[in-house]
A protein has these predicted regions:
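Short, flexible loop segments at the rims of nucleotide/cofactor-binding pockets, characterized by
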Residues: 12, 95-100, 125-128
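Residues at secondary-structure transition points
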Residues: 14, 62, 66, 103-107, ...
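Gly/Ser-rich helix-loop-strand patches that form or flank binding pockets
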Residues: 20-28, 106-155
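General small-molecule cofactor/ligand-binding pocket signal
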Residues: 35-37, 97-101, 148
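A short acidic, glycine-rich active-site loop
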Residues: 56-70
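Ordered, amphipathic secondary-structure segments that act as subunit-interaction surfaces
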Residues: 71-82
Length: 178
């Protein structure tokens, strides 16, 4: 099986550079289509307020939409700076695309990631919280696809030495088959 599609869940901060570099390095090596989408955290409406005050739900939604725009801008700017062309219907070589209408919540990675060969995410760092961990777990356990966690600084080469951690679960069997 050859890798032809890469999914990159995007957040709107500079720590994403390493994930983008890693995805591009793999994309160039395998001549892949790289797709990004804004990883947006969901908030339940019953959790919006507390005894000391609250966060207006509309303000939260506006902030979430603004973060999604920033994530898209980071992704598209990076791809354009590295001369990666946007995908067309006939493109069969290295190209990129953006999913505008991604659902909120970390579980989207698990369901949407099933149609991709690999999911590239940044490793946990100071910007990460428990939601980021759940997003990684969703991608790994629900998509059944391999997750490539990018190191804090981008690698110079990729796929020369590979370590696979496997706990013998059925969820990971398909990821290992790659």
């Amino acid at each position: 099986m050859s890798m032809k599609t890469i999914l990159v869940p995007m957040e709107s901060h500079d720590a994403m550079q390493s994930a983008l570099e890693t995805a591009l390095l793999l994309g160039r090596r395998c001549d892949c289509y790289i797709e990004g989408f804004a990883l947006r955290w969901t908030i339940n409406e019953f959790m919006v307020g507390d005894a000391m005050g609250g966060v207006p739900l509309e303000t939260y939604r506006e902030d979430n939409a603004e973060e999604a725009k920033k994530a898209k801008q980071i992704f598209e700017t990076f791809m354009q700076q590295h001369d990666v062309p946007p995908a067309t219907e006939t493109t069969e070589s290295l190209s990129f695309g953006w999913l505008d209408n991604a659902s909120e919540g970390e579980s989207f990675i698990g369901s949407y990631g099933r149609v991709f060969d690999v999911i590239v995410m940044k490793r946990r760092d100071a910007h990460s919280g428990p939601m980021h961990d759940r997003a990684i777990e969703s991608g790994l356990f629900e998509s059944g696809r391999p997750i490539l966690l990018s190191p804090p600084s981008p690698p110079r080469q990729i796929a020369t030495n590979v370590l696979i951690a496997w706990n013998c679960s059925t969820e990971q069997a398909r990821a290992i088959a790659l």
